[in-house]
């Protein structure tokens, strides 16, 4: 990869990881457009920029994490369903990384967002703080998160929808989605590291450093701006974007 490709992919990861539009789906499409082979170098790079996004969440929520055992329990509970499903079906999941499936997941996810928003009443969703989320709700959100194993679904999208259906307001559902990303992304990164341990070290170190820095700051900016956005607006634009993006993929990339 050249430096332009490194920066572009890092920006995409940083922006899309925490928006309900699937970072994996965007990285797959852009990598295909750049004709980048899925080899050891590419795998190491993707692990690096994903870890950068994890660090961005840790930095942004460092005060909430400190000495907050209850929050950690809820995050771990939400991880259990996707963790189990990932271990049981990871071989099948890797076979789903096709443009057709990504595009279909984009469209279906977009439709779900539009339906949920149509019937959503903010004033009736009385859970407005992370501390008020129950263990049962954490588990239900985790079950919704398991659907994100399907490429193109969006982990953040699945957890946000799950949170809204569990009586969380938009901002709280979004924040819990950010925090719930930590064990999922960390587990996915560790799984890739173990799987490709013999290939670690492949690639240009300077590319990895640049990718990490760009992804970290883009993720941090996205988290802050997205929370401000969702305090005033809804997820309808993201639903429409997902549908349009999925249709474009089917029209131009599926033969």
From Swiss-Prot:
Its main location: membrane. One of its GO terms (cellular component) is plasma membrane. It is an enzyme of class 3 (hydrolase). The keyword Zinc does not apply. Keywords: Cell membrane, Hydrolase, Membrane, Transmembrane, Transmembrane helix. Pfam families: BacA (PF02673). It catalyses: di-trans,octa-cis-undecaprenyl diphosphate + H2O = di-trans,octa-cis-undecaprenyl phosphate + phosphate + H(+). PANTHER family: UNDECAPRENYL-DIPHOSPHATASE. Belongs to the UppP family. Catalyzes the dephosphorylation of undecaprenyl diphosphate (UPP). This is Undecaprenyl-diphosphatase. It comes from Methanococcus aeolicus (strain ATCC BAA-1280 / DSM 17508 / OCM 812 / Nankai-3).
